[in-house]
Curated annotation (Swiss-Prot):
A single GO BP: mitochondrial electron transport, ubiquinol to cytochrome c
Family: Belongs to the cytochrome b family.
Intrachain disulfide bonds: none
Requisite cofactors: heme b
Gene that this polypeptide is encoded by: mt-cyb
Function summary: Component of the ubiquinol-cytochrome c reductase complex (complex III or cytochrome b-c1 complex) that is part of the mitochondrial respiratory chain. The b-c1 complex mediates electron transfer from ubiquinol to cytochrome c. Contributes to the generation of a proton gradient across the mitochondrial membrane that is then used for ATP synthesis.
GO MF assignments: metal ion binding; ubiquinol-cytochrome-c reductase activity
UniProt entry tagged with the keyword Chaperone: no
GO cellular component: mitochondrial inner membrane
Protein's recorded name: Cytochrome b
PROSITE patterns for this protein: CYTB_NTER (PS51002)
Lineage of source species: Eukaryota, Metazoa, Chordata, Craniata, Vertebrata
UniProt keywords, alphabetically: Electron transport, Heme, Iron, Membrane, Metal-binding, Mitochondrion, Mitochondrion inner membrane, Respiratory chain, Transmembrane, Transmembrane helix, Transport, Ubiquinone
Length: 96
C-alpha cells in the first residue's frame, strides 16, 4: 500500500516537475501553489517515503526477533531488496 501511494504521488508530481536547473525551484513552487492539492500530494510523497522505510525497518526487526536470519537465501534476497530500495530512494532524492 505504501509503495502504491508512492508511485501514484510520484507520477502526479512528475507531471508538473521540470528538472532544468533554471526552472526546478519554480516548478516545485508551481506544484505547491497552482496545482489543485499539489501541496498535499507533495507532502504525501515526502512523508510516505519516511513511513515506507519505517515499515521496512519494522519488517526487518520482526525477522530478527523471530530468527528469520537463519534462512540464509531468503535473508540475502531481503538484504538485496533493501539495498535496491535505498539506492532507488537516493537516486530519486539526490539526482533530480
Amino acid at each position: 500500500l505504501c509503495x502504491i501511494x508512492q508511485i501514484l504521488t510520484g507520477l502526479f508530481l512528475a507531471m508538473h516537475y521540470t528538472s532544468d536547473i533554471a526552472t526546478a525551484f519554480s516548478s516545485v513552487a508551481h506544484i505547491c501553489r497552482d496545482v489543485n492539492y499539489g501541496w498535499l500530494i507533495r507532502n504525501m510523497h515526502a512523508n510516505g517515503s519516511s513511513f515506507f522505510f519505517i515499515c521496512i525497518y519494522l519488517h526487518i526487526g520482526r525477522g530478527l526477533y523471530y530468527g528469520s536470519y537463519l534462512y540464509k537465501e531468503t535473508w540475502n534476497v531481503g538484504v538485496i531488496l533493501l539495498l535496491l530500495v535505498m539506492m532507488t530512494a537516493f537516486v530519486g532524492y539526490v539526482l533530480p
